[in-house]
């Protein structure tokens, strides 16, 4: 069911535009707004680093990581998302893409990474009590976990339902997500062995939309 849900989502999510406002063909975007917010510097990695994205989708952020000289590994549950990533980036950068559930991939993975990240990805849609320990095990000493997602709705914390619409004749597909306020995220990360955890809500850019972006960073 979940694989079907994310394949359905893939058909609704447009491919990343060819260039950003600065004319760049690859870039890193933590937020739901184009040309807004910090970039890959949050990861603290560079040439020769090994970086994993959990829930890599169509690979736009991961491709930018690869252009910075890092080994870029991505895992996603959706075959449709990975096909789109391969079609877009195969002739441009080298990505190591794996079709799997993030928990399953991490359980069998023997590599370690300098950074693991998720942008509206697997960290949002996986129980942190199960996911965070497996990420912690695969991070090198001092390695970084960073992730972004929408902030929680006031009073709606923990496991929540998200709906992915289908045709008018079909019920939406349901996936679970985990929402917490910034102080609770830092507490959860510390409980699972992470250090120097920070969490903040980046404000939306000027304009009619007001919802910001939750950005969380912690070190192993």
Pin down the residues of each PLM region.
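Conserved class I S-adenosyl-L-methionine
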Residues: 1-47, 60, 144-176
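Class I SAM-dependent methyltransferase SAM/SAH-binding core
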Residues: 50-52, 58-104
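A short acidic, Gly/Pro-enriched loop at the edge of an enzyme's catalytic core
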Residues: 107-116
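A short glycine-rich, Lys/Arg-flanked "PGG" loop and its adjoining helix->strand segment in the class I
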Residues: 129-144
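Short alpha-helix
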Residues: 176-193
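Conserved S-adenosyl-L-methionine
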Residues: 194-205
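C-terminal lobe and adjacent flexible extensions of AdoMet/dcAdoMet transferase-like proteins
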Residues: 214-220
